Amino acid sequence: MKFNVACIQLTCTNKVEENLQSITDYANEAIKAGAEFILTPENSSLFSLDGKELLAKCEGYENNSFIQSMQKLSKSKKKWILIGGMPIKVSSSKLVNRSILINKSGEIVKTYDKMHMFDVVLSSTEQYQESEKYLPGQEIAIANLPWGKLGMSICYDLRFPKMYRKMAKLGCIFLSVPSAFTKTTGEKHWHTLLQARAIENFSYVFAPAQTGTHFNKRQTFGHSLIISPDGVILAEKKSGTGFILAEIDGSLPDILRKKIPSLHLD
């Protein structure tokens, strides 16, 4: 079955309403262009590295106003939407980074909490300790789309190939990798890692991304990608905000897996 996927690329701020408006505008444009499934990047609702700001501005999961707005958008347009990642407050001092899949009726059908925390030292001036603010998720998430199974992940998960192998072996033919990759690591690894995950699992990869220089001077890499199961880049947005669109053939992963039956030989 063929369908159209859109990945939205954003330069999010620390203002939730501002980010929501950007997503709504680009989602509407993507839908007019034929998108049936729309994905947003990591940190879609709020972009901040400040733990106090995150805890002050983030809501819990229940009755979350940002999520409810996205549900209304999905229901009104009758389209599937993946909130790629957003901070959810789970205690007075901790959050989770949650990806939320919404069906065309506006119902939440699956959530995934980012499992691998981005705790890295890239240089003396660029360091990240995600675990100081966030709790890691404990299990993978697989969702049933109308076109096949989706394996959900977020950003730094991309560097852990066994996670994707497991999801592919459980029947996933689509992999979502919403991200806010740093410019530093993105320039070196982004394309290679995403194409590797697509090729080794014969799965489509949908990777919406944050881009540019944000209000807090953090730089994200952009280059949102839609990649075929044989590693071909079907669509890419190198920089700037907006969206990319590609037609997806849900029968292709199985065709490739039969030609090269490597998926179940390890």
Regions found by a protein language model. Name each.
Residues 52, 100, 111-118, 225, ...:
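Short beta->alpha transition motifs characteristic of CBS
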Residues 90-170, 183-185, 192, 255-265:
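Active-site catalytic loop in hydrolytic enzyme cores
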